[in-house]
């Protein structure tokens, strides 16, 4: 076992939520260690965020109404109040004053409007807002005397002691030439999960590869509460390809139209807000029209696309897409609205453990996330959790970490790839945009068997790939089980058998 490291606050993840937690804790004088499994800390979901970050401007109540409406009755008003109450100050203090993010606008900020927003309130930088936030954030933290950063350091498991989380075990692949190490214990006064999303559970996702739900899985296995796992959001307009890229909501906000293979605009038939309807509505409509006619394209002719969205125009050119004839789009996995249950400062049900960002269920999003609120939620909850974690002033409490097998990076050829193919196939086919009770039961059976195979193999060796497979299987099971236990459609959880279940004589029994 490698010598242990101690720190006041351990942050697992280097996106906007993890950076926010690290900044707030460091400002309180705490020692902070940020560990990310990415080879570069900037390889986080935040860096892929396009559209922007919503703020309240001078009307927090209208943002609250829009969030609650998008959440389809499942959002927590107290959590939404916390978000809109902190929004303006957090954006101004951190993003504008501290980091100097170059938001678009020559004289003042250029606020954009996106789907399901009643007003223009979204700050953006081209269609690469996350990239322009995360780079300055990481550089600022790297220069902070209270913050240390570890890249290519994956958390394998949380360390617990009598119901409290006392740190985590890391798998390290240092770039310095030092030997790789597995089972490196880091003991912390408080641990903050900021591990991002679950995109690797699906064949097509807007998330970076490696988004295997690690924080949700580790927390669940340690005994933390996980809620609303069924609410997996599918973005309606990703490039229709095996390797998709996101076509930001902001493009529709500027006037782009959705047309089927017959050239017909169809969204007015599905919702009064047409292309600016909530994401779940647009995603199901796009899927239906694509199934019926063979293709859906985003018509960008109503706007000066290359001038307003040069990054997206370049992405189209790189793929050989002639955007002047429309961009082929289809829904793909985008965001987990549920996750590790937390309160308004990011506390989980386990002592000393916090969760922020996409791995957390704050209650803000309910059954469906409003466009451009993920960066804001990550920032606000990161700041709240970091300040609270540092304020707890708990000394690291070294305890006995779980024993790991010898490190074995050499899995049988194709082992991890084959298991992930099976997992993604069952998630796509049975736990996707449209669901039935029978499909969800089938998925649970396959995922249980897959997890059993991975667990059996892991009894004799340790590998980062094995732990990521385990995490993906655990989270897949949590999603399928929650979806199966919720027969009512809401937001991005759509039960296509709901009407039949309501008509059946034994419904509800």
UniProtKB/Swiss-Prot annotation:
The active site is at 279 (proton donor/acceptor). It catalyses: L-aspartate + O2 = iminosuccinate + H2O2. Its main location: cytoplasm. Gene3D superfamilies: FAD/NAD(P)-binding domain, Fumarate reductase/succinate dehydrogenase flavoprotein-like, C-terminal domain, Succinate dehydrogenase/fumarate reductase flavoprotein, catalytic domain. It is found in: Cytoplasm. Its cofactor is FAD. Residues 499-509 have a biased composition (Acidic residues). Residues 402-412 have a biased composition (Basic and acidic residues). FAD binds at residues 14-17, 45-52, 214, 358, 374-375. Pathway: Cofactor biosynthesis; NAD(+) biosynthesis; iminoaspartate from L-aspartate (oxidase route): step 1/1. The record marks 114 as: Important in orienting the L-aspartate substrate. PANTHER family: L-ASPARTATE OXIDASE, L-ASPARTATE OXIDASE, CHLOROPLASTIC. This is L-aspartate oxidase. It comes from Halobacterium salinarum (strain ATCC 700922 / JCM 11081 / NRC-1). The gene is nadB.
């Amino acid at each position: 076992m490698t010598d242990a490291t101690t720190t006041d606050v351990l942050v697992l993840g280097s996106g906007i939520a993890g950076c926010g937690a690290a900044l707030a804790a460091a400002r309180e004088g705490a020692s902070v260690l940020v560990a990310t499994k990415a080879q570069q800390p900037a390889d986080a979901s935040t860096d892929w965020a396009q559209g922007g970050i919503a703020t309240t401007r001078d009307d927090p109540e209208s943002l609250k109404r829009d969030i609650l409406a998008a959440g389809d009755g499942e959002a927590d008003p107290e959590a939404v109040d916390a978000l809109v109450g902190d929004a303006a100050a957090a954006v101004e203090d951190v993003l504008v004053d501290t980091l100097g993010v170059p938001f678009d606008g020559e004289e003042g900020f250029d606020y954009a409007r996106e789907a399901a927003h009643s007003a223009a309130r979204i700050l953006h930088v081209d269609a690469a807002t996350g990239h322009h936030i995360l780079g300055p954030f990481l550089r600022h933290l790297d220069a902070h005397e209270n913050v240390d950063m570890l890249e290519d350091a994956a958390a394998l498991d949380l360390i617990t002691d009598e119901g409290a989380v006392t740190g985590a075990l890391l798998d390290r692949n240092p770039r310095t030439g030092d030997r790789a190490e597995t089972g490196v214990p880091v003991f912390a006064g408080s641990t903050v999960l900021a591990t991002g999303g679950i995109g690797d559970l699906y064949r097509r996702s807007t998330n970076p590869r490696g988004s295997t739900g690690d924080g949700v899985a580790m927390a669940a296995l340690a005994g933390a509460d996980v809620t609303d796992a069924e609410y997996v959001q599918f973005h309606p307009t990703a490039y229709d390809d095996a390797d998709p890229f996101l076509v930001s909501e902001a493009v529709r906000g500027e006037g782009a139209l959705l047309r089927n293979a017959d050239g017909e605009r169809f969204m007015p038939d599905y919702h009064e807000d047409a292309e600016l309807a909530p994401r779940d509505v647009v995603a199901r409509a796009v899927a239906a029209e694509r199934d019926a006619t063979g293709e859906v394209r985003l018509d960008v002719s109503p706007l000066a696309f290359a001038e307003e969205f040069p990054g997206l125009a370049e992405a189209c050119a790189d793929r050989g897409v002639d955007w002047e004839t429309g961009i082929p789009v289809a829904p793909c996995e985008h965001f987990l609205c549920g996750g590790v249950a937390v309160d308004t400062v990011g506390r989980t049900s386990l002592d000393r453990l916090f969760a922020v960002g996409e791995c957390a269920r704050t209650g803000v999003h309910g059954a469906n996330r409003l466009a451009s609120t993920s960066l804001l939620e990550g920032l606000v909850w990161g700041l709240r959790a970091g300040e609270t974690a540092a304020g707890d002033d708990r000394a690291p409490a070294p305890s006995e970490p779980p024993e790991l097998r010898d490190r074995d990076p050499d899995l049988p050829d194709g082992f991890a790839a084959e298991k992930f193919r099976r997992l993604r196939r069952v998630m796509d086919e049975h736990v996707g945009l449209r669901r039935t009770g029978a499909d969800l039961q089938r998925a649970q059976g396959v995922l249980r068997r897959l997890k059993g195979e991975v667990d059996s193999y892991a009894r004799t060796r340790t590998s980062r790939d094995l732990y990521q497979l385990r995490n993906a299987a655990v989270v897949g099971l949590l999603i399928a089980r929650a979806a199966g236990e919720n027969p009512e459609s809401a937001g991005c959880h759509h039960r296509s058998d709901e009407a039949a279940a309501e008509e059946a004589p034994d419904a509800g029994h």
